[in-house]
């Protein structure tokens, strides 16, 4: 069930849902606007010949902090990691989804490339996957509205929410944009037994 503005306010008041720092004016009819922090991670294209999700590549990105009153310039075709200004904390029975702002999308800014879903139990600053698909550079101002977060109540509380000992929960408690940690639980299925155009069953 998608939470309404009334539901979101009730969850915040009860302390079950956390958004820090929070401003009342950020609440929309069924979402909450989130803002851009001043921290970014830029890809260094000269450190590795290719990106391999199975390998630890610690120098793939470099950390950049911009002055709070100055913009970060995102060039056409560029992809960087950013993060929400807000620290987001979810209870065990609420999941969230980050969506871009329509007005920014019409300028060619993509807020997240794929990872918009946030598991129940998560706590941290949400990493943004920012892309410029326009033909001109885009100024990204720290503190600007960068996306909107909607919340979904689960039919029951998660048995093992994000952050549980059973899961690696690689991004729990993250501060600022966090580089990929896909190598920590990389999984690859053996597909050698299948033939093209035929089902394995």
Swiss-Prot record:
The active site is at residue 129. The record marks 116-117 as: Important for bifunctional activity. InterPro entries: dCTP_deaminase (IPR011962), dUTPase-like_sf (IPR036157), dUTPase_trimeric (IPR033704). Keywords: Hydrolase, Nucleotide metabolism, Nucleotide-binding. Residues 166-183 have a biased composition (Polar residues). CDD domains: trimeric_dUTPase. Pathway: Pyrimidine metabolism; dUMP biosynthesis; dUMP from dCTP: step 1/1. Its EC number is 3.5.4.30. The keyword Hydrolase applies. Bifunctional enzyme that catalyzes both the deamination of dCTP to dUTP and the hydrolysis of dUTP to dUMP without releasing the toxic dUTP intermediate. Belongs to the dCTP deaminase family. This is dCTP deaminase, dUMP-forming. It comes from Leifsonia xyli subsp. xyli (strain CTCB07). The lineage of its organism: Bacteria, Bacillati, Actinomycetota, Actinomycetes, Micrococcales.
């Amino acid at each position: 069930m998608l939470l309404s503005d009334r539901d979101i306010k009730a969850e915040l008041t009860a302390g079950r849902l956390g958004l820090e720092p929070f401003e009342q004016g950020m609440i929309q009819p069924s979402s909450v606007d989130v803002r851009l922090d001043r921290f970014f991670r830029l890809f260094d294209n000269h450190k590795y010949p290719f990106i391999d999700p199975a390998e630890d590549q610690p120098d793939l990105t470099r950390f950049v902090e911009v002055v709070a009153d100055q913009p970060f310039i995102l060039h056409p075709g560029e992809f960087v990691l950013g993060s929400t200004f807000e620290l987001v904390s979810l209870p065990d029975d609420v999941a969230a989804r980050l969506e871009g702002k329509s007005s920014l999308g019409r300028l060619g800014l993509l807020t997240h490339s794929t990872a918009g879903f946030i598991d129940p139990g998560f706590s941290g600053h949400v990493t943004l996957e920012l892309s410029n698909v326009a033909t001109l550079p885009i100024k990204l101002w720290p503190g600007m509205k960068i996306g909107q977060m909607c919340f979904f109540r689960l039919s029951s509380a998660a048995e093992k929410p994000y952050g549980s000992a059973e899961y690696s929960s690689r991004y729990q408690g993250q501060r600022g944009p966090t580089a990929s940690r896909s190598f920590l639980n990389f999984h690859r299925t053996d597909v050698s037994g299948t033939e093209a155009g035929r089902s394995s069953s």
